[in-house]
Amino acid sequence: MVDNNYAVRLASRNGYIEVVKYLVSIGADIKADDDYAVKWASRYGHLRVVKFLVSQGADIRVNNDYAVQLASENGHFDVVKYLVSQDANIRADDDYAVKLASVNGHVEVVKYLVSQGAVLNQ
């Protein structure tokens, strides 16, 4: 038997929205392992998957708003903007999202996060 919870995380990581939708329809738990599916979708920039998972109840704020940190670290501007629109806390973990975007050279993300209240000098 296939572990649908693990399968939905892998499909989310790879951006396979139709697979994610199907797995959810047959009972995959998108909240398994502290909402890992939405974290992986955010890390790899799969906005459609992130939006779907949020619409199904994924918690973007789990683990100190790790989803927005991962999206920021990897320069996924559209995902960052969406997560912020869904009340992700960009100041979580001592403004770690903007620090990750900075260290990885994602200037567009850095500018956006600062415009939304992130603090650089801590």
UniProtKB/Swiss-Prot annotation:
Gene3D superfamilies in alphabetical order: Ankyrin repeat-containing domain
Instruction: Note the SMART domains from the entry.
Output: ANK (SM00248)
Q: Which UniProt keywords apply?
A: ANK repeat, Repeat
Positions annotated as ANK repeat: 3-32, 33-62, 63-92, 94-122
Q: Name one Pfam family in it.
A: Ank
Which superkingdom? Viruses
PROSITE patterns named in the record: ANK_REP_REGION, ANK_REPEAT
The record's section on InterPro entries has: Ankyrin_rpt, Ankyrin_rpt-contain_sf
Chain ranges passing through the membrane: none
Q: What is this protein called?
A: Putative ankyrin repeat protein L22
Organism of origin: Acanthamoeba polyphaga mimivirus (APMV)
